[in-house]
Regions:
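Pyridoxal 5′-phosphate
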Residues: 1-365
Length: 365
């Protein structure tokens, strides 16, 4: 990223050195994200962030809706995969149906969505993994059911990206969004869309902008330094498995498998430790298995979430408190009005020692 800013780039398509550099950066970033998603580079677009992209896509899709149609959203999602769709549906006079996650387990069973599907539903929007309580959703099953009902599928993979190998072909989704800062890159948003879906989408754009995907979805001049950072982040993830043979996609597969194993070990250690702290309650899936990632929402009896986070910060452990934009999750759990929950998460660079430090800090409250 610093090299791009230091060396300088121009806009795309100029036919001179600094413009050619921007072209190369863009091409390489599309290839990198195509490898990460198991997609084609022509199906990858970039934007400011996932939220901005979702607002743009929701407005474009809403122009194809009519009164009598319906959409399905969920109570498990980050608000960026909820409010843009609800606002678009409200403005289009379209019914909003909400699939609820299970309060006891934190899981969103595909059957909760299936019950809401009929010929009226034109879109299902759901997360791959919850940013609040760590639940992993069986989005392949959701996609199959939604498509059978004639609906499009829009997946929020922001929270899943650093924890799970993403495969848009296996998911059979129409759209998928992610944010590169979540997988250790710069602040930017990435959109995958099936090529025919992108081509048919009437997006809001200025007249000189490209009329074909993927460029038609990229409003204004993009952050080329961020695109370079995205490529570097994908290469970093691919390198975690070592320098063995295979394509970048194959190396990503190996890396994410190692990450998954390591994070499961940390999660098991954390859950075993928390079980000995009767004042601490973990919300969501209670075991460290494929139904969750290593993201835990906690309530501590007698202590507000903000106070707990502040105490952990004093011993060098930085965790979130509140709702983390998962407003519906906190509402459904009944904790939104009391300050939300503490969120503690583990990724590939965390250690067992850090898990123990977190447990000790919770025990000392």
């Amino acid at each position: 990223m610093s090299g791009v800013l230091r060396d300088g780039v121009s806009n795309l398509g100029g036919g001179f050195g600094s413009s050619d550099y921007a072209d190369t950066i863009t091409i390489e970033a599309r290839r990198a994200m195509a490898d990460m998603f198991s997609a084609d580079p022509s199906e990858i677009s970039f934007g400011q962030n996932m939220t901005s992209i979702t607002f743009a896509v929701s407005r474009a899709l809403a122009n194809t809706w009519a009164p009598g149609d319906a959409i399905v959203v969920t109570s498990l999602d980050h608000d960026a995969n909820f409010t843009p769709w609800v606002r678009a549906a409200t403005e289009a006079g379209v019914e909003v149906r909400i699939a609820e996650f299970d309060l006891a387990t934190g899981e969103l069973d595909p059957s909760a969505i299936a019950r809401l599907l009929d010929a009226k539903v034109c879109l299902v929007a759901v997360c791959v993994a919850s940013n609040a309580i760590g639940t992993v959703v069986d989005v392949a099953s959701v996609g199959a059911m939604a498509h059978e009902a004639g609906a499009l599928v829009y997946l929020d993979a922001v929270h899943a990206a650093p924890h799970r190998l993403l495969d848009v072909r296996a998911f059979d989704c129409d759209f998928l969004v992610a944010s590169s800062y979540k997988f250790f890159g710069p602040h930017a948003g990435i959109l995958y869309g099936k090529l025919d879906r992108l081509a048919a989408l009437e997006v809001y754009k200025v007249r000189p902008a490209p009329s074909d995907p993927p460029g038609k979805l990229e409003t204004g001049t993009q952050s080329f330094e961020s695109m370079a950072g995205i490529t570097a982040a994908v290469d970093y993830l691919a390198a975690l498995a070592g320098s063995g043979p295979g394509s970048r996609r194959e190396r990503l597969d190996r890396s994410l498998s190692l990450i998954n194993d390591h994070e499961r070990s940390l999660s098991e250690r954390f859950l075993e430790g928390v079980a000995s702290l009767p004042e601490v309650r973990v919300f969501g899936v209670p075991t460290a298995d494929q139904r969750r990632v290593g993201t835990f929402a906690l309530g501590v009896t007698g202590h507000g979430a903000e106070a707990v986070a502040a105490q952990l910060a004093r011993v060098g452990l930085y965790v979130w408190s509140g709702h983390y934009y998962a407003v519906n999750v906190m509402d459904r759990l009944g904790v939104h009005d009391t300050g939300g929950l503490v969120r503690i998460g583990f990724v590939h660079y965390n250690t067992a020692t850090e898990v123990d430090r977190a447990l000790e800090a919770l025990a000392d409250l």
